[in-house]
Design a protein with these regions (language model features):
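Bacterial N-terminal signal peptides that target proteins for export
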Residues: 1-7
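Short helix-terminating capping/connector loops at secondary-structure junctions
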Residues: 27-28, 81-92, 122-125, 225-229, ...
Length: 358
């Protein structure tokens, strides 16, 4: 078994906005949430015997036990966290899953492992918030229809600050922390000039982002505005080599439009899945080669890019905590061993970064 480990990324003062909220409002903010991606419930390895439904569900439930087992666990007491004295991990406001929920359309098994009513723990029920991935079928698939039902249930329970007209994109507002779930990627339509390499699906296909960028722009304009409140964005495709290879899961033009839309907002983090790897990195990479920059943006590279903290999610657990104006991100690998405080990042965000002006 892989030794449990924490990868800690600490961003001190990352959430200090241009317009500073009242001190009492910041003092009251204490938000914890968990993020995983790519559980691929129902996956069958063609080189191994077929797994039964019981095996699939059993493995998934053990994964949930490892994730929820971090609740009540002390944060690392050494390194840069020592001065913050964060205490123990609280019950999260939500468990977010950044796509590729299933393989083989096993929505039945997925909802047994991650019930629509929430994951039950000894400390309470945890709502589950979903994004779709490229393995989750076309818009009329059982998984997509199931995700829509879960989103509408969150809406009826008044957990959401906003939801798109089609019910597939949404946002929550946790004490002034805005978390947006944007599906496959924050774009509006399939890029017809550079379509997905295999199958070349068009509008209405499984790779259609379904107006996610327009939903994001509208939400940020109407619910965040010039407040400087922190924003977290989640979608399936990222900025890693797999997400930006010549299959064109999403395209340089789409990424540049996304980048431009974030100007003026206090983006605390971007979360994604797809590459099955837990990591923290900056986008755009300030040390990127000209070739890498072209891969990200084509011929439309921003001249003096603002960078964003990006967290790639595997199938175990990023733990995020926002207290006042501090943002802590740590990766938990399961029960049993200790803490790994590498890599450690300590940085502040300047007003220029927050404005995003070039």
């Amino acid at each position: 078994m892989q030794v449990a480990r924490w990868m800690v990324a600490i961003l001190v003062a990352v959430l200090v906005p241009v317009h500073v909220p009242a001190a009492d409002a910041l003092a009251e903010r204490d938000v914890t949430f968990f993020v995983i991606s790519d559980p691929h419930i129902g996956f069958q390895d063609q080189n191994k015997p077929t797994r039964s439904t019981e095996d699939i569900i059993g493995d998934g439930r053990r994964q949930v036990e490892r994730i929820t087992g971090v609740i009540g666990t002390p944060y690392p007491d050494g390194g840069p966290l020592a001065a913050l004295a964060p205490g123990t991990v609280a019950t999260p406001r939500g468990l977010l899953i950044a796509g590729d929920l299933t393989d083989n359309q096993r929505w039945d098994a997925f909802t047994t492992i991650f019930p629509p009513a929430g994951v039950t723990t000894a400390t309470g029920s945890i709502p589950v918030f979903l994004c779709v991935g490229n393995h989750d079928g076309d818009p009329d698939s059982p998984v997509r229809r199931g995700v829509l039902e879960v989103n509408r249930a969150h809406e009826r329970a008044r957990r959401l600050a906003a939801i798109s007209d089609d019910g597939m994109h949404y946002a929550v507002n946790w004490d002034g922390l805005h978390v947006l779930c944007l599906g496959l990627c924050p774009a509006d339509t399939v890029d017809v000039e550079m379509p997905f390499k295999y199958g070349k699906p068009g509008p209405g296909s499984w790779n259609d982002p379904r107006q996610a960028l327009s939903f994001m722009k509208k939400y940020l304009r109407e619910h965040v505005g010039t407040s400087g409140q922190p924003v977290v964005l989640m979608h399936h495709y990222g900025f890693d080599g797999f997400s930006t290879n010549d299959w064109y899961w999403w395209t340089p033009q789409q990424r540049r439009a996304y980048y431009d839309a974030l100007a003026g907002y206090n983006v605390a983090a971007i979360l994604h899945g797809h590459d099955h790897h837990a990591a923290h990195y900056l986008w755009p990479n300030p040390e990127a080669s000209a070739e890498e920059t072209r891969r990200q943006f084509g011929d439309q590279s921003p001249p003096a890019p603002r960078t964003f903290d990006v967290f790639s999610c595997g199938n175990l657990c990023w733990v995020f905590r926002v207290t006042g104006d501090q943002f802590v991100a740590a990766h938990y690998g399961g029960h049993g061993a200790g803490w790994d405080t590498e890599p450690v990042i300590v940085k502040s965000v300047t007003s220029r970064n927050l404005s995003g002006k070039e």
